[in-house]
Regions:
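Residue-level recognition of well-ordered beta-strand positions that form the cores
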Residues: 73, 103, 132-134, 350-352, ...
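Assembly/oligomerization scaffold segments
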Residues: 1-153, 185-206, 241-246, 329-332
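Secondary-structure transition/turn motif
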Residues: 74-78, 133-138, 189, 219-228, ...
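N-terminal export/assembly leaders
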Residues: 141, 159-189
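Helix N-cap/coil-helix junction residues
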Residues: 109, 168-170, 362
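Acidic, small/polar-enriched beta strand-loop surface segments
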Residues: 1-46, 152, 196-378, 390-411
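Short solvent-exposed strand/turn elements
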Residues: 124-144, 377-399
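Envelope-exposed proteins and targeting segments
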Residues: 68, 110, 127-129, 215, ...
Length: 411
């Protein structure tokens, strides 16, 4: 059984039920620990929730991750969430940038900031409010870099340098930044958003940049320590030593969506370094299909070459891949529910599927690149966007990531 919880941050001052109130014989006693000076506190509004939707991450491996978004629909028959209703407890507090956190069985699902309160009035004196929310990437997208003149440094140091800028001022406790393996150019930057520049850093690293489900900024270097799969999404309910979750839907594709026979890369140096490589055999089979990126920050030409090779060996052939898998949380037991809610972008899972129940089964390790939730009272669905794991870290002695003679040694 899944129990969603939605909490919103308000500063109600003296109206806070547990807040200190001057001259009150109960709430105004000095040195008490029950009634405290209020400030912004989280208030549980779960009893009003009609639906919750969340979308984080991306749907294609070569896309960049933009701001995660969420939408929460609440019962508003009593006008509690009407910004013009002066008698409402939250009057004066219903403004953008209020913090919201969404949990399920006390597991974090989404942490973001209010963008809009959209009111809808329905026949029969019914009313709802839809709260639109974006994660902290929304703020970074609106934070222009005034001027940055960095030294040549590793990608992780560059991420921290940007986050430390006065115009960004990202808290130390809300970041998890790995060191990085790519040396970046010392070129001056101005007039671009902090998010756009950080995404360029991540692409140059061949890493991963996202906001976690509990609101932290995460930067993973390439070849970051890889989790070995301990969860299988399957259409087979046979007992297993590994946690197995029955999916309700799986989407698989095979074709040219991510097929590139030529890779063209360049950095943004004053005299750009350029790399163009091609798999001529693949071009003969599929024609010229070019992936190009001329906005990279890599300083070392050899590093550009390695990145191009990594991209080519990954995408120079059509791949059968699982694009997404959906589970119905209402149908899972407590162990399965906790395992699903614990998954995060970058985690590795295994998908086991027998099409039309005609053997043999298809079994592939995949990396999670996106997570979406669509929860209503009748049914609560969670969908994971997937990247086929044909390129990643080689893990010695791992049954899935330790196979010899494959392309997963990376660089």
């Amino acid at each position: 059984m899944i129990s969603p919880k939605v909490e919103i941050g308000f500063d109600l001052g003296a109206n806070t039920p547990t807040g200190f109130k001057l001259d009150d014989p109960v709430r105004g006693v000095l040195d008490n620990t029950t009634y405290i000076l209020a400030g912004e506190l989280f208030y549980d509004i779960s009893s009003r929730v009609q639906s919750v939707s969340v979308r984080r991450g991306k749907s294609e491996a070569l896309d960049r991750i933009d701001a995660g978004i969420s939408s929460v629909v609440l019962d508003n028959n009593d006008r509690l969430f009407d910004p013009l209703y002066e008698a409402g407890l939250y009057y004066g507090q219903l403004v953008p940038r209020r913090q919201i956190r969404i949990l399920a069985n006390d597991n974090p699902v989404f942490y973001g900031y209010v963008e809009d309160f959209d009111l809808e009035y329905l026949p029969g004196n019914r009313a709802t409010v839809q709260i639109d929310i974006a994660d902290a990437f929304g703020a970074l997208a609106n934070a222009p870099i005034d001027e940055l003149d960095p030294p040549s440094e590793l990608s992780g140091a560059r991420v921290n340098r940007v986050l430390d800028l006065p115009e960004v001022n990202w808290p130390e406790e809300l970041r998890d930044v790995e060191e990085g393996k790519t040396l970046l150019l010392d070129s001056t930057v101005s007039g671009v958003s902090a998010l756009e520049y950080l995404q360029r850093v991540s692409t140059s690293e061949f890493g991963n940049l996202f906001i976690s489900k509990d609101g932290d900024l995460i930067f993973k270097e390439r070849n970051s320590a890889t989790t070995t799969p301990d969860l299988i999404f399957s259409d087979d309910t046979t007992p297993s030593a590994t946690t197995k979750v029955l999916f309700s839907n799986v989407r698989s594709i095979y074709g040219s969506e991510n097929l590139y026979t030529r890779i063209s890369l360049a950095n943004t140096d004053a005299i750009p370094e350029e790399v163009v490589i091609e798999n001529e055999a693949a071009t003969g089979l599929y024609g010229v299909r070019t992936y190009s990126n001329t906005n990279l920050l890599n300083q070392d030409p050899a590093d550009l070459e390695d990145l191009a090779q990594a991209l080519l060996v990954t995408y120079d052939r059509p791949l059968y891949r699982f694009q997404a898998v959906t589970v119905v949380l209402d149908k899972l037991d407590s162990t399965q529910t906790e395992a699903v809610l614990d998954l995060e972008i970058g985690d590795i899972v295994q998908v086991h599927f027998t099409p039309s129940q005609v053997p043999p089964a298809i079994e592939l390790p995949c990396r999670i690149i996106g997570i979406s939730h669509n929860w209503e009272p009748q049914v609560k669905r969670t969908t994971f966007a997937l990247e086929t794991l044909n390129f990643g870290v080689f893990v010695l002695d791992s049954p899935l990531l330790g196979e010899l003679d494959n392309d997963r040694l990376s660089y």
